[in-house]
């Protein structure tokens, strides 16, 4: 029997957004729950990247993150999903570390995320999802994205 998830964390980079929304709503089965969508601005850049270039990259990624979070909210809420409470969170840092931190801070019941694997690495999980699987304090629902 599937647990009654009341607080769900959905980290996204914008890829596979429709699949993440679909799986999240399937887990809810129309029940009341809070969905926290997380976008992490990955601030890791090569060592010799000029400061101005890094600042520009972070600004662009932040703008993209805001757009993605708005799209996620549209897909998860509305008249067809009246029991879903939505909250958007944006962080900067290492994506896997931030996902685990938010899961701990928010005491979430489950994380719904894509595998992140590519056709080249189809025998492995994506590095972010692999790290989250090992360190997350809760159940992980991985959505196959390839």
Swiss-Prot record:
User: What span is annotated as the signal peptide, if there is one?
Assistant: none
Q: Check the record and name the SUPFAM superfamilies matching this protein.
A: Adenine nucleotide alpha hydrolases-like
Give the superkingdom in one word.
Archaea
Concerning InterPro entries, the annotation shows: Rossmann-like_a/b/a_fold (IPR014729), Universal_stress_UspA (IPR006015), UspA (IPR006016)
The family note in this entry says: Belongs to the universal stress protein A family.
Q: What name does the UniProt record give this protein?
A: Universal stress protein MTH_1154
